[in-house]
Curated annotation (Swiss-Prot):
It is an enzyme of class 1 (oxidoreductase). Its cofactor is [4Fe-4S] cluster. GO terms for biological process: isopentenyl diphosphate biosynthetic process, methylerythritol 4-phosphate pathway; terpenoid biosynthetic process. Coiled coil: none annotated. Belongs to the IspG family. This is 4-hydroxy-3-methylbut-2-en-1-yl diphosphate synthase (flavodoxin). Pathway: Isoprenoid biosynthesis; isopentenyl diphosphate biosynthesis via DXP pathway; isopentenyl diphosphate from 1-deoxy-D-xylulose 5-phosphate: step 5/6. The gene is ispG.
Length: 388
């Protein structure tokens, strides 16, 4: 077999814009803002009172690459569960608080890494800021000022008539000023809307008004497909301009799916190290093999590998050889056989029936070599799949 040196890039991959300069806060062990990597969050869907189920879901999220997790706290029973969850979680826990200010203090005392407060629906929130700031400071707890289009303060709604970008930003800046007035600066801000255009405009406006770390999110984004499109569109617009320090993809789907989408958005913008990527042509009348089946079988066979490896599955002679040469590993198919490329070099030609097996074997061999070089386990996570 021909020996091909894979190597690693000598310089970091290019990004579309430098990160916006912000202050840094800590959410437990995770830095948010400044030069900290952009983190990916999700929220549990289990009743917080079901401690075992909640911890199990947090473990699944952690394994999928989640950096920070949020749990709901709508009742006293939920608040009582927080100390155990915060202590046993593998990643920092944020308590999500609405309506009742007493649960903000309960979450802080429970040891949660951070608390999300909604100034639009917590009773007499402005009157509570001084005490919240003091408690958070004493316990080393950070705060997210979570402004949401669906729950703006009545005064703001009366002024603007609806949840405009200006309305969202005015609410956020006012609350930020209250915390800062009391000497508390360990907070980040979100201004969420379910319309990506309004959401992007609000974050762009907010980014000009202060150096606060920003939590990006499209609220109530919808089912998996629709929510993925909305989040990718909005996050891409902001992150490509350097705006955003932590993200949460909101989907009507299992929380693990939110992490997969969030990680892939960051990887596609070179804001997180790329993992395994399957590139496959969309197929057309020129295709001489079943590209869909080949791509699905290769993806299934490589599931669980986590290495910066691009695998191209191409179906004809037009773009096939060129695309396969550009990939780390690839196949250009035609006439009942496939040419296998590694780093631009043809290493073998195999019958069509052996393409999938050969690609998987070569990928596993490369993964082992890369794992040995890095001293790490290269088999974990899920592959990234794209269509060229």
């Amino acid at each position: 077999m021909t020996s091909v040196s894979l190597g690693m890039p000598a310089a970091p991959p290019p990004v579309l814009a430098p990160r916006r300069k912000t202050r840094q806060i800590k959410v437990g062990s995770v830095g948010v803002g400044s030069d900290s990597p952009i983190s990916v969050q999700s929220m549990t869907t289990t009743p917080t009172t079901d401690i075992n189920a909640t911890l199990q879901q947090i473990a699944e999220l952690t394994a999928s690459g989640c950096d920070i997790v949020r749990v709901a706290c709508p009742s006293a029973d939920d608040a009582e569960a927080l100390p155990i969850i915060a202590r046993k979680s593998q990643i920092p826990v944020i308590a999500d608080i609405h309506f009742q200010p007493k649960y903000v203090f309960a979450a802080i005392e429970a040891g949660c890494a951070a608390v999300r407060v909604n100034p639009g629906n917590i009773r007499k929130f402005d009157d509570q800021v001084k005490e919240i700031a003091a408690a958070a400071r004493d316990h080393g707890t950070s705060i997210r000022i979570g402004v949401n289009a669906g729950s703006l303060e009545p005064g703001i709604m009366k002024k603007y008539g609806k949840a405009t970008p200006e309305a969202l930003v005015e609410s956020a800046v006012w609350e930020a000023s209250l915390f800062e007035e009391h000497g508390f600066h360990d907070f980040k801000i979100s201004v969420k809307h379910n319309d990506p255009v309004i959401m992007v405009a609000a974050y762009e406006m907010l980014a000009e008004k202060g150096d606060w770390p920003l939590h990006l999110g499209v609220t109530e984004a919808g089912p998996a497909f629709q929510g993925t499109i909305k989040s990718a569109t909005a996050f891409g617009a902001l992150l490509s301009r350097g705006i955003g320090d932590t993200i949460r993809v909101s989907l009507s789907a299992p929380p693990v799916e939110e992490i997969k989408v969030g990680n892939q958005i960051l990887q596609s913008l070179n804001l997180r190290p790329r993992k395994l990527e399957i590139v496959s042509c969309p197929s057309c009348g020129r295709a001489q093999v079943d590209v869909y089946t080949l791509a699905e079988q290769v993806t299934a066979g490589l599931e669980g590998m986590e290495i910066p490896l691009r695998v191209a599955v191409m179906g004809c002679v037009v773009n096939g050889p060129g695309e396969a040469r550009e990939a780390d590993l690839g196949v250009a198919s035609g006439n009942g056989k496939g040419q296998i490329f590694v780093k631009g070099e043809v290493i073998k030609t195999v019958p069509e029936s052996e393409i999938v097996e050969t690609l998987i074997e070569e990928a596993m061999r490369i993964a082992e070599e890369m794992g040995e070089a890095d001293g790490e386990d290269a088999v974990k996570g899920s592959p990234v799949v794209s269509v060229s």
